[in-house]
Every structure is written in C-alpha cells, then in structure tokens.
C-alpha cells in the first residue's frame, strides 16, 4: 500500500488538536464528512407506511412525500436495537437508514418479520447500502455552499425546512439532498450514485474553499453529536435500554391503530421503575479531566451505580463532557457523584462530577437553521 507515514498524526496531542480544529470548523464555518457507511434499505409497496409504523416506535402514516423522520427501533422486549432517518420518496416508497454496524442485522430482522409474521403486507425490501454515496455538508455556512453547488433547488430556510429532502442536480449529477443533522448544526446530506461519490466529494471540497471547508471523520463526529446529547446505539445503549431510559418518551406513539414491536413490553412494571439506569450528562469539577469511557460511577458505599458511555473534550465549550447511564439518574441532576478512574502510574482515583442534562450545547436547538 505504499508509504503513508505523513498521512497520520504522530502523537496523542496531535490527534486531539486535529479533532479540536475539525469540531470548531463545523461549529463556526463549515465541514464535510463521508456518511456513506450508514445502512440503507429501500422499502416499497402499498403497505410501506404500515410496515414502518410497525417496526418504528413513532407514527409514519401521515409523513408527506418530501419529508424525513427520525425513527427508533426496539425488539419484542422493548429494548432499543437501532435508529436512523427514513425518507418518504412517495406514498409507497421510503429509504430507511440504519446505523453502520446494524445494517445487516436490521435488514435480516425486518425480513424475518415481513416473511413470518406480516406476510399479508405488500412490502418489498432491498439493501441499497452500497448503491449510494453520501457527502454531508455541515455548519453555519452550509446553505451558502449548497446554493453554489446546486442551482435547481431553493435552499431558503422557509422553503427547504429541517427534516425535508429535495431532488436536484449537484455539479451535474442527479442527487437526493436531505436536510438532516447529527451535529445540531445546519446540515445537508448529498446522496448520489456510488460511482459519483469521489467526484462530488472533490466538487464540494473545491467549492467550499472560500469558507475554509474542513473534512472531518468519525472521531470529530462523535464529539459533535455528544455535545448535543444525541445517542449512538450500541455505545450509549447496551441492549437493555428502553426509549424511556434514554429520555426519549417523546418518540413513543400513543394512538397507533396497530401496536409496534416492543410496545406491549413497556407496560411491564420493571421497565417503568425509577431505579433503572437512565441517560444523563456528567460534568467533571476539573474541566480538563476527560473521563475514560466505561468508568464506573460509585455511591457512598463504593458500589457501582452506573457507568460512563461517551466521554470527550468539547472544543466549543472549552471543557470535558460525558454521557453516562446512572441509576435513578434523572432525579440526581444537579447532584455530585464520584467516578472511579485508573490513572497511569497513580492507581485508582475518584473524580467528582456534577450530574447534568445530556444536552450540553445549543439546548434550544437554534443552530440547526444556520446563518441567514
């Protein structure tokens, strides 16, 4: 593969500086990311809406063509197994996205339900993960850049709203452009046929030079989403977490005519106990201390009552932040807890942290509309 010694950072400090620069570029100007790895499932048929309403916890029957919606998927026990955004192409056609690691298992699970339990539904599934490339354009200046790249779409805020999509032509290539965001910033995801992926990437990079566009990767993305309190299934959940455990009661439909997978399990008393682990934020008293992920939260008897799921230094906030699962966590917001960590050459140490909301940045969600 040749000599690529100059293409990687040489120290932990260099790595952290790179992440910082990329996060700040996204928050203050514009960044771009290859989001092609997300799973994609094409859902078609007269009962496509009904199918989505059964596999997701929220409602899909009234989602208009041209719109997108975030969905949470549970198993029969009511535990979160995946999440993603699905796009309504027309009344009988949707494109579902899944987590990168969950693409194959979600597709297999959906086929199992369709073939063994709901064979009466007119629905056809196709895995299209490899058929599309996705370039995410993210940051306050994203709208300005998209106007340069695509002249046949009206990108004004009132005409292209958050969680909508539009067909258009980007640098001469047919594309579906979704206005969705995993950073909390104004963002557009350009979806094109896979063989045009590199070409569109280069065109976006070239057009964005006037705003010092900065490519960023998974590590920076993790920081950005944690600042907004967005979960990653499999990192902030562990197969035993319900939507309520991660503060997402709002995504549980109350009036669906047909129950969705996992709905009946939510009536089990054990899943409604205040003693369950709940998603919270942690703010270290020493703002420069970044808690190791997996560290245990201990009570005054030294027993574990939770653990750190995600932990980063936030460049925009100038301090460390962490997400954690804490027993009865929501009732402890504002209180001080201890996190036990292992320090190299120093042994065990207990770090005092304040329990906080899991949303650290732009709590009101104003940044998603970007600059005028």
Regions flagged by a language model, labelled:
Residues 2, 23, 71-79, 166-171:
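Short, solvent-exposed secondary-structure boundary motifs
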Residues 6-7, 69, 292-294:
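Short loop/turn microsegments at loop-to-beta-strand junctions
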Residues 13, 89-372:
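Conserved, structured C-terminal
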Residues 13-16, 20-71, 79:
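Acidic, proline/glycine-enriched N-terminal capping motif
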């Amino acid at each position: 593969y040749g000599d690529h010694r100059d293409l990687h950072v040489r120290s932990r400090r260099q790595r952290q500086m790179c992440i910082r620069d990329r996060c700040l570029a996204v928050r203050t100007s514009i960044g771009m990311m290859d989001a092609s790895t997300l799973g994609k499932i094409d859902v078609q048929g007269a009962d496509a809406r009904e199918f989505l309403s059964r596999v997701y916890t929220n409602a899909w029957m009234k989602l208009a063509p041209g719109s997108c919606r975030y969905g949470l998927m549970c198993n029969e026990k009511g535990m979160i197994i995946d999440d993603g955004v699905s796009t309504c192409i027309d009344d009988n056609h949707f494109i579902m996205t899944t987590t990168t690691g969950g693409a194959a298992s979600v597709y297999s699970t959906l086929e199992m339900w369709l073939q063994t339990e709901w064979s009466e539904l007119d629905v056809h599934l196709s895995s299209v993960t490899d058929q599309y490339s996705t370039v995410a354009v993210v940051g306050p200046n994203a709208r300005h850049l998209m106007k340069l790249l695509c002249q046949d779409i009206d990108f004004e805020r009132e005409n292209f709203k958050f969680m909508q999509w539009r067909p258009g032509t980007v640098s001469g290539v047919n594309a579906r452009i979704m206005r969705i965001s995993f950073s909390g910033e104004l963002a557009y995801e350009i979806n094109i046929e896979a063989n045009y992926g590199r070409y569109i990437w280069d065109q976006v990079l070239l057009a964005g030079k006037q705003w010092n566009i900065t490519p960023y990767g998974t590590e920076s993305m993790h920081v950005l989403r944690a600042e907004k309190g967005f979960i990653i299934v499999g990192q902030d959940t562990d197969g035993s977490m319900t939507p309520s455990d991660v503060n997402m009661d709002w995504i549980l439909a109350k009036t669906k005519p047909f129950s969705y997978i996992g709905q009946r399990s939510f009536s089990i008393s054990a899943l409604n106990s205040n003693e369950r682990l709940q998603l919270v934020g942690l703010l270290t008293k020493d703002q420069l201390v970044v808690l190791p992920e997996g560290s245990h939260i201990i009570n005054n008897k030294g027993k574990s009552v939770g653990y750190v799921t995600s932990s980063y230094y936030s460049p925009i906030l100038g301090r460390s932040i962490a997400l954690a699962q804490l027993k009865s966590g929501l009732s402890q917001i504002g209180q001080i807890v201890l996190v036990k960590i292992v320090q190299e050459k120093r042994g065990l140490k207990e770090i005092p942290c304040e329990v906080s909301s899991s949303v650290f940045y732009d709590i009101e969600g104003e940044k998603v509309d970007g600059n005028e």
